[in-house]
Amino acid sequence: MDRREEEEEETGYGEKGTRNQSKEDESRLGKIFELIPLDMIPDILLRLPAKSAVRFRIVSKLWLSITTRPYFIRSFAFPSSTRLCLMACVKARDMRLFISLHQHDDGSYAHVDRCEIKSPKHDYYNPSSESVNGLVCFGDFYNIVVWNPSMRQHVTLPEPKPHSTVRYFIRSCLGYDPVEDKYKVLSISGYHNGNHDPLVFTLGPQESWRVIQNSPLDIPLPTGGSRVGTCINGHVYYEAQIRFKVDDIFNFENILMSFDVRYEKFNTIKKPADPTLRNFMLNYQGKLAWFCSDYSSIRFWVLDDGDKQEWSLKNFILPFPISPEIDPIFECRVMLTGVTHDTGEFIFINATMCDAFCVLYYDPKSGSERRIEYEGIGDREFCINTGILECKRFTIDWFPNHNESLMSLVNVLKKAD
């Protein structure tokens, strides 16, 4: 197998158009790109979509070397805000369909990018965390799958092996250490006796699950279909439950946990004293936010200082109702799914699949809103093609501020030679 065939197998981009390209066309293409100054090549490649950047690896050994360097891959994962998208993941039958909806389209109607990937044998429905630099993680109980939709790749991690076999759930979160440029999966097993068993897996060759020593007694709440955690600035945040004893009686308290991905240390964070029942975490422009919403307003607390545990309150009255009320413009139910990193706009999507799928971006500071209708999502043809109409169970998960990644998952489970 030559280098190009290896590249096609690794990236999943070995499609007919590339494989059948004649040597004459490749030679002509190479001569054109030889005219480009060397110092401009990385900047040009960083502006391309992931699919194009991967295919341009056939131009020359130099271009292959540039696009596979760790520095280039890392830079590609932090694009300008205009390239961020709202990604939908449809799980139905034995496949996952990843749909990218660009967050900064100017028009009222926009096209979408699609990528369909066959699921591995054990592919569970629940997402474990938000998109982390283009990677997403799904898992439940004993199977954890990390996906890179841009490279059309996924890897199923080995089953975590805790100390005890008597456990009743496992929760996992994907995190990123920006200092050492490492991705880690945190997995915590819960037991009926209230103990815990935290493990961590670094994405890379010759790695395995490691026990995290000296961690506190905490148990992540079984959150069902909602995400367990979110990664912000090298820390994974997730909701947890701690147990303590008062007068020989065990009590429980719901708190937030912070996990330092680099140093693998835990820290407890006291949640704001807010009586609202509908609570959830979001990344609010690079800070952890604890959202407390009702059907006409959004109130959220922003963690300004994690060490001092200082929260600031923000409160906004919405000009439209939130699910379960029917919005008169959407003519269906809408729900909050995220906040744009750059502009701080709230992202509202259809809570149910409508014939015309729309996303509403609302700027709470200016009170302005923009509505984008995305073609080919939610209509009958879409439901037939994805198999939704035939499935008794399917899910659609949303990942705001998703970006493309060139990180390869092929060698994650590779053993030493």
UniProtKB/Swiss-Prot annotation:
Residues 1-12 have a biased composition (Acidic residues). Pfam families: F-box (PF00646), FBA_3 (PF08268). Residues 16-25 have a biased composition (Basic and acidic residues). Transmembrane segments: none annotated. InterPro entries: F-box-assoc_dom_typ3, F-box-assoc_interact_dom, F-box-like_dom_sf, F-box_dom. Residues 30-76 form the F-box domain. Residues 1-25 are annotated as: Disordered. PANTHER family: BNAA05G37150D PROTEIN-RELATED, F-BOX ASSOCIATED UBIQUITINATION EFFECTOR FAMILY PROTEIN. This is Putative F-box protein At4g21240.
